[in-house]
A protein has these predicted regions:
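Acceptor/aglycone-binding surface of glycosyltransferases and processive sugar-polymer synthases
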Residues: 1-6, 11, 23-97, 124-147
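Catalytic donor-sugar/metal-binding loop of nucleotide-sugar-dependent glycosyltransferases
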Residues: 71, 92-95, 104-122
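Short, charged juxtamembrane terminal tails flanking transmembrane helices
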Residues: 152-153
Length: 153
């Protein structure tokens, strides 16, 4: 959240720092920019994770699509380019993995126009996922429920 708030340029490139995405594919996001596009979101061509993460990621995305009518395929693909001016209109509050959903839903509510491109997904090179730790799962679930109440699709 602080990075979004501190940004000064017209566009914000947002990705993970664990090496699961190739930053050189940013040029592919840039090629999708038009005056009418507000966010270019990547979606994983082939998720390079273990079977449990693949199944849970698939299920999570399907559930979110059913509940929120999300305008993109892969809400948790942290490889996106976002028009900075949109952040003047929204305030991100989530402190868990729900921030991706909150970002997409609030941008959708503001009328943002989305574009998508496939991106490569690689094995994690740095750090460990904290997503499956019980406190994180509970926090994300709690924040997702709050979002469902606050931001109906």
């Amino acid at each position: 959240r602080r990075g979004f708030e501190a940004s000064k340029k017209d566009w914000i490139f947002y990705t993970d720092g664990d090496g699961q995405y190739d930053p050189s594919e940013l040029r592919d996001l840039v090629e999708q920019l038009t005056p009418t596009i507000d966010i270019v979101n990547g979606y994983k061509m082939a998720r390079n994770d273990n079977l449990i993460r693949k199944i849970s990621g698939f299920a999570y995305n399907r559930i979110l699509h059913a509940l929120y009518l999300i305008p993109i395929r892969d809400v948790d693909c942290d490889f996106r380019l976002i028009r900075n001016s949109l952040f003047n209109k929204i305030k991100l509050e989530s402190k868990s993995g729900a921030i991706c959903l909150e970002l997409v839903m609030k941008l959708k509510k503001q009328g943002a126009k989305f574009s998508e491109i496939p991106v490569h997904h690689y094995p994690r090179r740095h750090g460990q996922s904290a997503f499956f730790k019980i406190p994180n799962l509970i926090s994300t679930l709690r924040e997702n429920i709050k979002l469902l109440r606050k931001l109906p699709s």
